[in-house]
Amino acid sequence: MSRVCQVTGKRPVSGNNRSHALNATKRRFLPNLHSHRFWVESEKRFVTLRVSAKGMRVIDKKGIESVLADLRARGEKY
């Protein structure tokens, strides 16, 4: 399963670990993803989305119906 938020599109980014001596080694910063079930009142069913913490805040703000409409417009399955 890919590490991509279905709502915001956040994905892993690369950067460096830095020691006290400032040696750089490559690492990945992963998004804070969770599989979460949302109740969709209009469809009378639960929808499971893999969303980041920010994605959950977007759903709280815009509403699950609006977010699902955006996903449908992008052609993404949920």
Curated annotation (Swiss-Prot):
InterPro entries: Ribosomal_bL28 (IPR026569), Ribosomal_bL28/bL31-like_sf (IPR034704), Ribosomal_bL28_bact-type (IPR001383), Ribosomal_bL28_sf (IPR037147). GO terms for cellular component: cytosolic large ribosomal subunit. Gene3D superfamilies: Ribosomal protein L28/L24. Signal peptide: none annotated. GO terms for biological process: translation. It comes from the Bacteria. Disulfide bonds: none annotated. GO terms for molecular function: structural constituent of ribosome. Keywords: Ribonucleoprotein, Ribosomal protein. Belongs to the bacterial ribosomal protein bL28 family. NCBIfam families: L28. This is Large ribosomal subunit protein bL28. The lineage of its organism: Bacteria, Pseudomonadati, Pseudomonadota, Gammaproteobacteria, Enterobacterales. The gene is rpmB.
